[in-house]
Structure formats: structure tokens, C-alpha cells
Amino acid sequence: MIDVINLEKHFDGNRVLNGINVTIEKGDIMVVIGPSGSGKSTFLRCLNCMEDPTGGQIIFHGVDIADMKVDINVHRRNMGMVFQHFNLFNNKTVIENIMLAPVHLQCKDLKKAKRRNRIIKLTNLFRGKDKKKAPVEITTTKAEIVKNAKIKAEELLERIGLLDKANVYPSTLSGGQKQRVAIVRSLAMNPEVILFDEPTSALDPEMVGEVLDLMKALANEGMTMIIVTHEMGFAREVANKVLFIDDGQILECAPPAEFFGNPKNPRLKEFLSKVL
């Protein structure tokens, strides 16, 4: 699904990522761990080009999305992102937060189709009868887009037990509730992969479990996930690959049993001795 080849990222001459190579297959649950400042979050943000890579390739479905000539927004539709601090819009209700991206993007596509049809209609005036172009088929309206997005958002909120919070603002929610809303907001776009940047680190300990339970459910459904986290128990239980990054390099990548039970790299052994 995703091939990362010799990925590099520099900030003001400082090399934060140094030749990252890794493959993420469909259905992988890959947990990324490492000390603070090691490049974990930068790696994640480079995967959907929230940070432009300095060098290397990120091949997603055969397309190098690190190439500046590629329309990254087309590919971001298939790659959800969940942030450490939720990043909900405080001036919009919970359900509006979930509906925002699907409605915006589908309405944008609708406007493009209508504009194309106007151009086709105009240019057809100057074409011969046998050379006229057929208009783009339009099968929806803005009202239908909004209606369907609302239905989907309500289904997602019901799934996480927060349907009664649909019309409240994020400021009234607990941290755990905000993060669950952020996760289903990502699901509203029907992504093929979701990137999680330390999704529990800003939560009170009592609220961590409800977020991890939702992530476990997604894993059981086959969602491809790449997760930067300090939750070692979650990594042991749910991941099929665990990646250790230090000083901008991958020092070890292995299944959880091998990664935690028989680490090869001395730096990883040292790190695990301090966190387990």
C-alpha cells in the first residue's frame, strides 16, 4: 500500500529523518515508538505531506506523493489523520466537525462537474454533430450530499456512544470524547489508512482506555493504521509491526513478540529497559 524509500527531512540544516525505508501493507497495524525528538511525528506527518519531505519517495498506490507535481489533496482523501490535541473546530458542533470534510470535498467535486458541463455545452456549439462531447453525468445535489453526510455522521456517533452529543460544541466534551470524535471524523472520509500522532498522550489516564478500545475495534475490522504512541501494552496486543526510530533512523522493525521479547539493537534494548 505505502512504500517509503530513502525518506529524508531537514529543518534549517538539521537532519530529522535520515534515509527511512519501510513498507506498509494493507491491513497493517504499525506502531512507531522511540524517544522524544527522534523523528517519529515528523515521519508520520511526511507520510501525507503535511511536512514536505526533503528527499526520497513515498509511493502510495503506485504514485510518488512526495513529488511536488502530484496533487496531494487527491491522495489525502484516502489517508486520515488523528492528532494529539484533537484539532476539532471549537466554533462548530460535534456533528458539523464530522460532516465538514465530506461535504466540502463532495460539493467541490460537484462544482467541478457543473463547470465542466458548462464548458462542454459552450464548446459543443463549435463542434460538428459527430464530434460533440457528452456532458459529465451528475447523480447528486448539494442537498443530498449534506443529507448523506449527516446520516453517516450520526451512524458514527452512535457507534461510539456519543449520538446525544451531536449538537454540542467540543468545549463541553471530555478529552476522551474529543479524541473519539476526532477518530470518527477521520472515518467519515472512508480512508484506506489512518495516521495517529500520539492519540492518547494528551488524555487523563482514566480516558486512555476508551480511545484505545476504539482503535482496537478498527484494527479488528482490518483498518490499516500507523500509530505513533508510548502505549507499549497496546503495541504488544494490537500491532503486527513495531518500528523503533532514533535519531531519524529506523533501528529495528519486527513483530511485537520479537520486538519486545528479543530485541536485537542495543539502543532499543536500552530504551525498552527504561520504559517497560
Regions found by a protein language model. Name each.
Residues 1-256:
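ABC family nucleotide-binding domain
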Residues 253, 257-276:
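C-terminal boundary and immediately downstream tail of ABC-type ATPase nucleotide-binding domains
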